[in-house]
């Protein structure tokens, strides 16, 4: 089993250290003071807060972050600024148009700290080794890169040649979160070919990313029954609502390929939470 360590949880020692920083018994490596903080759990914007960081973990958010400041602590005065959680780009194709280095120039400036990319493109060109080389190129970057394994569900017949053995090797990696987008038409037309891949991914505790453009009502329901968890294809509020009612997580595209935000944003006027 191949592991990358990219999602390695806190150790007992790290957790104990964070507790000490939160209690003011140990000093932070970095403390941000005088900030407004967006709390995405409560929907509040809280004023005059501080954030204490130890290593790569946040230990404390509150009004007594000053207790964590020591002689070696880096202090940032964020007066007049607002801190939000880092943004996650949940679906993209890094290998399609640009290199990771070029992508980072723009992603970081927009507040993106984590990216989930498809890996279909390097597989077409170089197979399994191409995916591994691509994933290695995404390590040790200023932000976190995660990926999905090729679902091998495409309108192209040549794109359906990955064995279940290779898929299992990819799913064993902790930087592979699940299967990439799967076109609904192929799944409904060739369930015997595709559903074993879905079963394999779900058994590994991974997700199934969706591509449901053009599906609705019974066909959409049949697609969701396969275990699909998300979709980035809706282009208006009605399509978003239909998918939300079936339990899908929806991502909105706003970029060089599609600009759907204005239409989808109309859902806020429907009273839907």
Stretches found by the model and what they are:
Residues 2-22, 26-27, 104-205:
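Divalent-metal coordination cores built from histidine and acidic residues
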Residues 5-31, 36-84:
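Histidine-rich, glycine-flanked metal-binding segment
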Residues 30, 73-74, 81, 143, ...:
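A structural micro-motif
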Residues 35, 51, 56, 80, ...:
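Divalent metal-coordination and catalytic microenvironments
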Residues 63-64, 93, 119-122, 150-151, ...:
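Short, ordered loop/turn segments at secondary-structure junctions
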Residues 81-103:
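Di-metal (Zn2+ and/or Mg2+/Mn2+) metal-binding site signature of metallo-dependent hydrolases
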Residues 86-94, 115-117, 145-149, 177-181, ...:
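Hydrophobic faces of well-ordered beta-strands that scaffold small-molecule active sites
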